Amino acid sequence: YHQAHAPQAYAVDFVGLNAAGVRASGVHPQELGSYAIFGARVVAPCSGEVVEVADGLPDLTPPQADTENPAGNHLVVACNGLLVLLAHLRKGSVAVETGEAVRVGQALGAVGNSGNTTEPHLHIHAVLEGTGSVLTGEAVPILFDGRHPVRNAVFAR
């Protein structure tokens, strides 16, 4: 899915699993609270400066999507020569402002269902700073727990 958009070549979409090992209670539920990840805390993946923030867009009922605001509520952190996008955040949850310094692990917001998404998840991707915006720049691979994520990889926290 992300391969069609070069800056998102290494993008990762995180979903949560409930106690039954599935993403949501029910089959394609419309209730956002049915999704295991909805409302989960989002933390800074790196220390740096917040360079972009958008908040106030509605959390949409699945499978509605906002194609005019693809990242929905989101923020961008500049760190270590990269721009890191954290997208589809919950309306009103963004806890930082543009220009604010953040530390790795600092709470930034909560997972929502805003933007061009069909169910709650956290989208993250990084581009090389100076090669364009977070939506047009040169994609950079991201490591999680020291490894490259692949489809259906499980990361426990």
Feature-to-residue mapping (PLM):
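Short, glycine/small-residue-enriched coil/turn segments at secondary-structure junctions
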Residues: 1-65
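Zn2+-dependent peptidoglycan hydrolase active-site motif and core
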Residues: 36-37, 47-90, 95
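Short, charged beta-turn/beta-strand-edge "cap" motif at the junction between a beta-strand
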Residues: 20, 56-58, 108-116
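Short, well-structured beta-strand-loop connectors
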Residues: 41-53, 95-111
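Histidine-centered divalent-metal-coordination microenvironment in nucleic-acid enzymes
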Residues: 117-127
